[in-house]
Design a protein with these regions (language model features):
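Beta-strand-centric surfaces of beta-sandwich/beta-rich domains
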Residues: 1-191
Length: 191
């Protein structure tokens, strides 16, 4: 890229990466205001629909907007091998995202004012094994969730691959301040 920041007009989408392959995205860093109104999309090998489509902050595991703080008034931090998140200081992804022919990453500003986005996206041009998997991420939100109904996080995935994680966040309505019921269940193949 030729600049450390891009101004994204309200209601507009800009292209952050458009690279011919083969290659791999190796690291992404964003900072500044990265709230839910920024929508990141990633397309591999000229596909029509994105393999990744999510609010930028949610992609990095921050289910609430960037102003969310914990009980001590601090921003929650996610520190793992593949994601490092310190809201207000930076959002980092180290997931490798291979592509054979083309990688395209866009950012949409769904807000009502122009916003600056500070970012670095790095990778390498290299041969990619034919059987290499593509990176996918999805976003779901339901408010309110229907009482008594099972909430499905993800469904309909087919083919080989690895499930690497989920961010599940809950909020309460009214005076009820405790979420105490429910369990996470995962079904694979013919379960």
């Amino acid at each position: 890229k030729l600049r450390p920041t891009v101004t994204i007009p309200a209601g507009e989408t800009v292209t952050l990466v458009d690279a011919a392959g083969p290659g791999v995205i190796q690291h992404m860093w964003f900072t500044g205001y990265v709230g839910h109104h920024f929508i990141i999309r990633m397309y591999w090998d000229d596909q029509e629909y994105p393999s990744v489509e999510a609010p930028l902050s949610a992609f990095f595991g921050c289910a609430y907007d960037e102003n969310f703080v914990d009980r001590d008034g601090k921003y929650p931090v996610l520190n793992s091998a593949m994601m490092l998140v310190a809201p207000g200081r930076g959002y980092n992804s180290y997931f490798e995202m291979p592509f054979h022919k083309r990688a395209r990453i866009t950012m949409e500003n769904r807000g009502d004012k122009d916003e600056n986005l500070y970012y670095i996206i790095t990778g390498a041009y290299q041969e990619i094994p034919a059987e290499a998997g593509y990176f996918h991420a999805t976003y779901r939100q339901e408010h309110p969730v229907q009482k008594g109904r099972t909430y499905t996080i993800v469904d309909g995935i087919e083919g080989r691959g690895q499930f690497v994680g989920v961010t599940l966040a809950t909020g309460m309505n009214g005076n009820n301040t405790c979420w105490v019921e429910g369990e996470a269940r995962m079904y694979l193949d013919d379960d």
